[in-house]
Amino acid sequence: VILVLKGERVLIGHPDGRVVVNPTGNSGLGKAGNGDTLAGILAGFIAQAARMDIDIFETVVAAVYIAGMAGDIAEKKFGKRVMTASDVRECLTEVFAELE
């Protein structure tokens, strides 16, 4: 079991005791719908990793990082008080473009 503890700083725990503190994201991600967005990103990444025999823990770390980056972009564009889960999802294309 890999544990993802969602908060202003998301913690990702591995059964062997490793814990990663995600450096991206902000308190605006605590609003309704952003947990669902994160779950969808995680599901998509894990499905691809399983097909390509990629380490699932590293995949979860990457997915959480990217979700946080989208949240950071949404905060800059809309402000964390008013940003929504839809805003975060829309910012994913900018994240992927930035990472290419």
How would you label these PLM feature ranges?
Residues 1-100:
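Small-residue (G/A/S/T)-rich helix-start motifs and N-terminal tracts that mark the onset
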